[in-house]
Amino acid sequence: KVYEKYLIDNGKSPLTELDERSTLIRDHDASHVIFGLDTSLEEEALLDTWLLCGCSYKFSYLASYAKLPELKELTKKLLKEVGVTGFFKLYKSVIPTKLKIAFKNSRKMKKKWPFKHPEEFLDRKISDLREEFGIKILSPKERDLKKVIWSGSHST
Protein backbone atom coordinates (compact mmCIF):
# COMPACT_ATOMS: atom_id res chain seq x y z
CA LYS A 1 0.00 0.00 0.00
CA VAL A 2 2.91 2.38 0.66
CA TYR A 3 4.26 1.92 -2.87
CA GLU A 4 0.76 2.35 -4.30
CA LYS A 5 0.42 5.67 -2.40
CA TYR A 6 3.89 6.73 -3.62
CA LEU A 7 2.83 6.12 -7.22
CA ILE A 8 -0.42 8.05 -6.84
CA ASP A 9 1.34 10.95 -5.06
CA ASN A 10 3.79 11.13 -7.97
CA GLY A 11 1.20 11.09 -10.74
CA LYS A 12 1.64 7.41 -11.61
CA SER A 13 -1.08 4.77 -11.80
CA PRO A 14 -0.66 1.62 -9.72
CA LEU A 15 -1.67 -1.68 -11.27
CA THR A 16 -4.87 -3.26 -10.02
CA GLU A 17 -5.43 -6.95 -9.32
CA LEU A 18 -7.54 -8.97 -11.75
CA ASP A 19 -10.03 -9.69 -8.95
CA GLU A 20 -10.28 -9.30 -5.17
CA ARG A 21 -8.79 -12.77 -4.51
CA SER A 22 -5.76 -12.28 -6.74
CA THR A 23 -2.28 -11.70 -5.34
CA LEU A 24 -0.59 -11.45 -8.74
CA ILE A 25 0.62 -7.86 -8.38
CA ARG A 26 1.71 -8.48 -4.79
CA ASP A 27 3.64 -11.56 -5.93
CA HIS A 28 5.28 -9.62 -8.77
CA ASP A 29 6.17 -6.70 -6.48
CA ALA A 30 7.59 -9.08 -3.87
CA SER A 31 9.81 -10.62 -6.55
CA HIS A 32 11.34 -7.16 -7.14
CA VAL A 33 12.14 -6.99 -3.44
CA ILE A 34 13.49 -10.52 -2.98
CA PHE A 35 15.73 -10.23 -6.07
CA GLY A 36 16.75 -6.63 -5.26
CA LEU A 37 15.58 -5.01 -8.49
CA ASP A 38 13.82 -1.72 -9.17
CA THR A 39 11.01 -1.08 -11.66
CA SER A 40 13.04 0.47 -14.47
CA LEU A 41 12.64 -1.20 -17.87
CA GLU A 42 16.13 -2.65 -17.60
CA GLU A 43 15.57 -4.19 -14.20
CA GLU A 44 12.11 -5.46 -15.21
CA ALA A 45 13.93 -7.25 -18.05
CA LEU A 46 16.39 -8.72 -15.52
CA LEU A 47 13.51 -9.76 -13.28
CA ASP A 48 12.05 -11.78 -16.15
CA THR A 49 15.18 -13.93 -16.11
CA TRP A 50 15.08 -14.36 -12.34
CA LEU A 51 11.42 -15.42 -12.59
CA LEU A 52 11.98 -17.92 -15.39
CA CYS A 53 15.19 -19.43 -13.97
CA GLY A 54 14.97 -18.86 -10.21
CA CYS A 55 11.29 -19.29 -9.39
CA SER A 56 8.74 -22.03 -9.17
CA TYR A 57 5.49 -21.01 -10.84
CA LYS A 58 2.53 -22.04 -12.91
CA PHE A 59 3.13 -20.59 -16.35
CA SER A 60 -0.53 -19.60 -16.76
CA TYR A 61 -0.38 -17.60 -13.51
CA LEU A 62 2.87 -15.89 -14.46
CA ALA A 63 1.59 -15.15 -17.98
CA SER A 64 -1.60 -13.59 -16.61
CA TYR A 65 0.51 -10.59 -15.54
CA ALA A 66 0.81 -9.60 -19.21
CA LYS A 67 -2.99 -9.58 -19.43
CA LEU A 68 -3.42 -6.76 -16.91
CA PRO A 69 -5.17 -3.90 -18.76
CA GLU A 70 -2.81 -1.24 -17.37
CA LEU A 71 0.22 -3.25 -18.43
CA LYS A 72 -1.13 -3.71 -21.95
CA GLU A 73 -1.69 0.06 -22.20
CA LEU A 74 1.78 0.78 -20.82
CA THR A 75 3.36 -1.61 -23.33
CA LYS A 76 1.55 0.09 -26.24
CA LYS A 77 2.67 3.51 -25.03
CA LEU A 78 6.25 2.33 -24.61
CA LEU A 79 6.40 0.72 -28.06
CA LYS A 80 4.98 3.86 -29.64
CA GLU A 81 7.51 6.03 -27.85
CA VAL A 82 10.76 4.04 -28.11
CA GLY A 83 9.88 1.73 -30.98
CA VAL A 84 11.27 -1.68 -31.77
CA THR A 85 14.77 -0.18 -31.97
CA GLY A 86 14.49 1.02 -28.38
CA PHE A 87 13.52 -2.47 -27.26
CA PHE A 88 16.51 -3.96 -29.09
CA LYS A 89 18.83 -1.43 -27.41
CA LEU A 90 17.30 -2.28 -24.05
CA TYR A 91 17.81 -6.02 -24.48
CA LYS A 92 21.28 -5.57 -25.95
CA SER A 93 22.32 -3.73 -22.80
CA VAL A 94 20.91 -6.35 -20.41
CA ILE A 95 21.85 -9.61 -22.18
CA PRO A 96 25.20 -10.11 -20.37
CA THR A 97 23.54 -9.64 -16.98
CA LYS A 98 20.58 -11.86 -17.96
CA LEU A 99 23.05 -14.62 -18.86
CA LYS A 100 24.80 -14.24 -15.49
CA ILE A 101 21.44 -14.57 -13.70
CA ALA A 102 20.41 -17.58 -15.79
CA PHE A 103 23.67 -19.51 -15.71
CA LYS A 104 25.27 -18.45 -12.42
CA ASN A 105 23.05 -16.78 -9.84
CA SER A 106 19.89 -18.86 -10.25
CA ARG A 107 21.87 -22.13 -10.37
CA LYS A 108 23.53 -21.33 -7.05
CA MET A 109 20.18 -20.94 -5.30
CA LYS A 110 19.38 -23.51 -2.59
CA LYS A 111 15.81 -23.77 -3.85
CA LYS A 112 13.56 -21.85 -6.21
CA TRP A 113 11.62 -18.88 -4.92
CA PRO A 114 7.85 -19.53 -5.11
CA PHE A 115 6.49 -16.73 -7.30
CA LYS A 116 3.09 -17.18 -5.63
CA HIS A 117 4.51 -17.17 -2.14
CA PRO A 118 2.75 -17.82 1.17
CA GLU A 119 1.30 -14.82 3.00
CA GLU A 120 3.57 -15.61 5.98
CA PHE A 121 6.63 -14.66 3.93
CA LEU A 122 5.52 -11.03 4.19
CA ASP A 123 6.21 -11.15 7.94
CA ARG A 124 9.76 -12.47 7.56
CA LYS A 125 13.01 -10.55 7.17
CA ILE A 126 14.13 -10.24 3.55
CA SER A 127 17.67 -11.22 4.52
CA ASP A 128 16.37 -14.44 6.14
CA LEU A 129 14.36 -15.33 3.04
CA ARG A 130 17.34 -14.66 0.76
CA GLU A 131 19.50 -16.86 2.98
CA GLU A 132 16.94 -19.67 3.02
CA PHE A 133 16.60 -19.68 -0.77
CA GLY A 134 20.24 -18.87 -1.52
CA ILE A 135 19.41 -15.68 -3.39
CA LYS A 136 22.44 -13.50 -4.12
CA ILE A 137 21.24 -10.20 -5.51
CA LEU A 138 23.15 -8.31 -8.16
CA SER A 139 25.66 -5.69 -7.04
CA PRO A 140 25.06 -2.01 -7.86
CA LYS A 141 27.78 -2.33 -10.52
CA GLU A 142 25.99 -5.30 -12.12
CA ARG A 143 22.77 -3.27 -12.16
CA ASP A 144 24.47 -0.18 -13.62
CA LEU A 145 22.95 -0.46 -17.09
CA LYS A 146 22.36 2.06 -19.84
CA LYS A 147 18.80 3.27 -19.22
CA VAL A 148 16.12 3.79 -21.86
CA ILE A 149 14.59 7.20 -21.18
CA TRP A 150 10.87 7.53 -21.84
CA SER A 151 7.91 9.41 -20.37
CA GLY A 152 6.97 6.47 -18.11
CA SER A 153 10.38 6.43 -16.44
CA HIS A 154 10.53 7.15 -12.72
CA SER A 155 13.23 6.91 -10.14
CA THR A 156 12.76 4.25 -7.49
Regions found by a protein language model. Give the residues of each.
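Core of folded catalytic or high-affinity ligand/protein-binding domains
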Residues: 1-121
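Long, solvent-exposed, polar/charged low-complexity segments
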Residues: 96-156
